[in-house]
Amino acid sequence: MIYTWVNKVIRQNIRKRVEEIFAFSEAPIETQEQLLRGLISKAQNTTYGQLHHFEHISDREIFSKLVPLSSYATLKPYIEKMRDGQTDILWPGKIEWFAKSSGTTSGVSKYLPVSKESIEECHFSGGRFELALYCNAVPETKIFEGLGLRLGGSTQIQQEGKGQSGDLSAILIQNIPLWAELRSAPSHETALLSDWEEKLEAIIDEAITQNITSLWGVSSWFLVLFKKVLERTGKSNLLEVWPNLELFAHGGVNFAPYEQQFRELMPGTQVTFMENYNASEGFFAVQDDPSIDGMLLLLNNGIYYEFIPLDTFNGTASKTLLLEDVELDTDYAIVITTNGGLWRYILGDTVKFVSKKPFRVKVSGRTEHFINAFGEEVIVTDAEYALQATCEAMECRVIDFHAAPCYMNNETTGAHQWLIEFEQAPADLEAFKIALDLNLQSQNSDYQAKRKYDLVLELPRIIAAERGLFHQWLKEKGKLGGQNKVPRLSNNRSLIEQFLALNASLQTQP
């Protein structure tokens, strides 16, 4: 009886969500204007609202004049007050939850405020939009006759200051509504296990006998789970384990390197692949048409958007564009204002618009060079810190370096490959590798999580480059001198393959 009630509630919600999608697609600018007015009105009596004269803001242009662009570094003093239990700082009331996320240059981790509104009206709302879009596209779906298997990150919640902090997935599990929990796997108890290896085995114990009809999570984590499921069951693909599986909703990392493996694990056309774009800061977009390489920007999901052309990006001194002023196939840094208290916050991601009617985007990169092939979010400053600390400890010196991902396949786990040109090489390259790995883990908690038990990432693979490699590469590119430099991180292998080929040719020279 209770499952019949749950399914009825879900279907009613889906109809409402589909209507909302059509509404904001027809009036995107008006939707964003109305949303911004609501955010300003809600927060005008906060410390931040009073400081920046929210009471005088009547439109988007005045908003961009009175409120400065922000980064985590500029908002950190306010966030620290919120973590100390102070109220009405960036957002009304007391913030109980903080999503812990790596990627800043100001410390190991950043703590992003997660308000009640952002949980319900952004993160959960985004998931409901995705489900609604799928059901609207597949009206004969039987997805509600089974369970949705969700796979989050670490679920360790810590009491820090006057608030609770942890991975966003842990926060969402703690706040999941009853109707969603009843249609989800694994059980609440299993989802809250703090030990990842133990949790993975427990998920498999439960899920292999359940009617799983949908999968929700980061593709690199699921690849680990799927391999273990097939090992445990002896089946050749996932449809032999879950014959009614029909949806794989994925996000968090670049899916392209994994797609072929997933197609082999879920053969045929039975399973629909839907990409979503979300982060600790919010739920931004979802693929509304599987045939289109782009995601529908959610314009009434608690987030107001601005955009900075990447070729003019200058941090918090940048000039922004309104939604209606963007152009197709141009890289933009995203600026968000959210119902979690992030005001004109430079997210760090870059997107390209693939259509404007409706507004669809695809993630194109980061405002800095980075590696995020497995959800580790390693930026240049992380890598430089780890390398510097390792060199100091092992009395060696580096001229330059480049690192890129080695993707998972059926035989190997993922890894980072580092090509390092030494001025003075370490006496023991194996010890250097271990030290570099530990230093990077100490700097970046997301990398540390992916390294745990070698499930997603194994030890980095270090190659000592030939002397003069990077100078020669710059010379061949006509980029010697001036501000030209070697890109130190890449999220794909195109650049490192160039370096490796050139390195091999240098090895053959006398």
Language-model region placement:
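Active-site glycine/GP-rich loop and adjacent strand/helix microenvironment
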Residues: 1-55, 63, 67, 78-85, ...
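A broad detector of the eukaryotic-type serine/threonine protein kinase catalytic domain
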Residues: 106-107, 368
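Conserved AMP-binding loop of ANL adenylate-forming enzymes
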Residues: 132-177
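Conserved helicase ATPase motor motifs in RecA-like P-loop NTPase domains
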Residues: 99-105
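Short, basic alpha-helical nucleic acid-contact segments in DNA-binding proteins
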Residues: 126-131, 291
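Short "domain-exit" segments at the C-terminal end of structured domains
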Residues: 107-117
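Structural secondary-structure boundary motif
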Residues: 117-125
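Active-site diphosphate/adenylate-binding microenvironment
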Residues: 30, 34-98, 110-111, 121, ...
